[in-house]
A protein has these predicted regions:
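Non-heme di-metal
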Residues: 1-235
């Protein structure tokens, strides 16, 4: 989960600049994540967090497939077309079935797949994911990289996962997805940052990627606050 960064001079590459911008605006998400991890009713909060994560992650592959289609529809001479489509071609298979992992984790704590799939995602989750479709379909598919940079850029540490496991008392299976993302996302983050550094973006495209990323910080933080708000702390 994200941690706050200190101010510094913006670096030069596209990926490094985006990461710098994200680090500067992470405060709301850091605070929401800390409130989740340290919530006195974590046994009730954690399953809701897994459900919310499932609602978000089950949309990732369809969203990236849409972005790939839109990238391939760009003019052949567009300098973003081929590297963006190639990146998504490679990354989509890496993200397959992660939503199923979360359903497995929830089953490990007694919550059935059917009950999760019946739940209505919050309006905030719909905004978080739906905004990306707007950027991809009505502006430029490169904007989705800002969203991916946030979701895969701040994996949970082993220590944090151990703390959650200890405080909830849930079986290890309930933390499988968190642990796998903790292992995988650092590599995914580095790959994305390097790819962004190699892109030739217009100033407008660079702005779209940044806005996509930064609005996602606020909406993801709000999604966590929403689920915490369902369970007032007792005592």
């Amino acid at each position: 989960m994200p941690r706050a960064a200190s101010a510094a001079t913006a670096p030069g590459g596209e990926g490094a600049r985006l990461r710098w911008k994200l680090d500067m605006v992470l405060g709301p998400l850091v605070r929401a994540s800390e409130a989740l991890v340290h919530h006195p009713e974590i046994v009730e909060v954690y399953p809701r967090f897994l459900c919310t994560s499932h609602f978000i992650i089950r949309a990732s592959v369809p969203l990236m497939e849409t972005a790939r289609e839109r990238a391939l529809a760009l003019p052949a001479g567009d300098p973003v077309r081929d590297p963006l489509a190639s990146y998504l071609d490679e990354h989509i298979p890496e993200e397959l079935h992660h939503d199923e992992w979360l359903l497995d984790d929830l089953e490990a704590i007694g919550i059935s797949r059917a009950s999760v799939l019946r739940r209505v995602p919050s309006p905030t989750v719909a905004q978080l994911v739906g905004a990306q479709y707007y950027w991809v379909l009505h502006y430029h598919p490169v904007a989705v990289l800002g969203y991916i940079a946030l979701l895969e850029g701040y994996p949970p540490s082993p220590g944090l996962i151990d703390e959650l496991a200890g405080r909830t008392g849930f079986p290890e299976q309930a933390f499988r997805t968190l642990r796998l993302h903790g292992e995988l996302d650092q590599g995914h983050r580095d790959e994305l940052d390097a790819m962004l550094d190699g892109l030739v973006l217009t100033p407008e495209q660079s702005t779209a990627v940044s806005v996509s990323a930064m609005m996602s910080v606020d909406l993801y933080a709000q999604a966590i606050e929403d689920l915490i708000g369902e369970i007032p702390a007792r005592g």
